[in-house]
């Protein structure tokens, strides 16, 4: 049986801060497992990765530019080419999560799923039924959602609205708010 590969999945809409989150994670020496890492990038945002700032080597970056490339055969070939012991996926916000799960090789196991959302645009996404469905799709399987640029939602009414949105998709997903001066976990009592 092939070696099991842990997958760290980063999901969210375009411009929600996924690349920045992953870049910061890769700059943290505590994230160095000693394994080679396959970084799968499924969408191009405004920010590019800077591998020279990664805290460790052995990172192979691969682009998945079209959903048709998301197959078990292609992903297995990338695993073999990179010799990876773990995978980080920056997933396309317009693709459904189930499409990824259906494409993962049998030995790839989603170890952690993190969602990001932009506090300045989240209300717009939540108000549009098609975009809301895509957003809820990402939150449903995430352990944590980070609302960045949280100054835009830094009041009780906005946080209650976001809390309800997240709870519509998942009762288990933790909620964090990222402000310019740091990250904050704000507890809101469950109804």
Residue ranges: model-predicted function:
Residues 2-11, 16, 20-127:
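Nucleotide-state-sensitive switch-loop elements of NTP-binding domains
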Residues 14, 150, 191:
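Hydrophobic pocket-lining residues within nucleotide cofactor-binding pockets
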Residues 1-2, 136:
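Short boundary motifs at domain starts and secondary-structure transition points
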Residues 63-68, 175-183:
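A generic structural motif
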Residues 86-176:
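Phosphate/Mg2+-binding loops and adjacent switch elements
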Residues 184-191:
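Residue-level detector of conserved catalytic or cofactor/ligand-binding positions
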């Amino acid at each position: 049986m092939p070696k099991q590969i842990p997958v760290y999945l980063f999901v969210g809409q375009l411009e929600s801060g996924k690349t920045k989150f992953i870049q910061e994670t890769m700059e943290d020496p505590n994230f160095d497992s000693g394994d080679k890492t396959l970084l799968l990038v499924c969408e191009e945002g405004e920010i590019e990765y800077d591998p020279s700032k990664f805290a460790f080597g052995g990172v192979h970056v691969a682009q998945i530019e079209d959903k048709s490339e998301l197959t078990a055969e292609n992903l297995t070939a990338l695993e073999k080419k990179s010799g990876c012991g773990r995978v980080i996926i920056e997933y396309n916000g317009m693709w459904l999560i189930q499409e990824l799960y259906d494409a993962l090789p049998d030995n790839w196991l989603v170890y952690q799923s993190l969602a990001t959302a932009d506090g300045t645009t989240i209300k717009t996404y939540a108000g549009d039924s098609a975009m809301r469905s895509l957003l809820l799709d990402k939150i449903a399987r995430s352990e944590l959602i980070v609302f960045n640029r949280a100054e835009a939602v830094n009041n009780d009414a906005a946080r209650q609205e976001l809390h309800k949105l997240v709870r519509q998709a998942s009762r288990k997903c933790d909620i964090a708010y990222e402000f310019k001066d740091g990250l904050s976990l704000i507890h809101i009592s469950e109804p």
